[in-house]
Amino acid sequence: MGELPARPFLIGVAGGSSSGKTTVAERLAEMAGERHVALIKLDSYYVDLGDRPREERLAFDFDHPDAFDWPLLNDHLAALAAGAPVPVPLYDYVEYNRSGDVRLAHPARIVVVEGILVLWEPSLRERFDLKVYLDTDPDVRLIRRLRRDIAERGRTAETVIAQWLETVRPAHEQFIEPSKRYADVIIPEGGLNRPAIDVLLARVRELAGTD
């Protein structure tokens, strides 16, 4: 891998639910060279609800800023910056809780943090060298979420739509969309905007000093 810089180059990728955040983050990692990139997903840092009954976990608002363990995420980013690997929690989307397993994230030249609220939380936002917001049409995002949650998370269309109306859309309007003003780069169409992603990658390579 070669010698790591004094501190990694941190990128925050935000946007609404199913806006293409993971697609863009993984594309950046692939094109920059995965050995250069540590990818951190905000979903891994949902607060631990293991002591609550499943019915209560089902009713939890996962789109509110209070749903995330910001101190743990900040501790992990500080450790990566100091050159230490970190045990990233793995989240179980079927049980609505941490699985108990972890994924070891290693220090890298570039650290990409992606999630709905990474530009909303001040303690996290101030760490980023580059802040990206994916501005994807709400209808497109809802369709993507329906397909994903039904296929991958054992949900029904009715429960997905109910959650969208009760928590996802209100949180987007109150927290996520307003955080766009903090972005250095706004990408329309999210992960489908290949030209914008290519330009972003070139800039990341330039700023981070990777080949």
Language-model-detected regions and their locations in the chain:
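Conserved nucleotide-sensing/catalytic segment adjacent to the nucleotide-binding pocket
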Residues: 38, 47, 51-95
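Hydrophobic positions on the alpha1 helix immediately C-terminal to the Walker A/P-loop
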Residues: 24
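Post-Walker A helix-loop "phosphate-sensing" segment adjacent to the P-loop in P-loop NTPases
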Residues: 30-38
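P-loop (Walker A) phosphate-binding loop of NTP-binding proteins
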Residues: 16
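Conserved lysine of the Walker
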Residues: 21
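ATP-dependent NMP and nucleoside kinases share a basic, alpha-helical "lid"
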Residues: 99-153
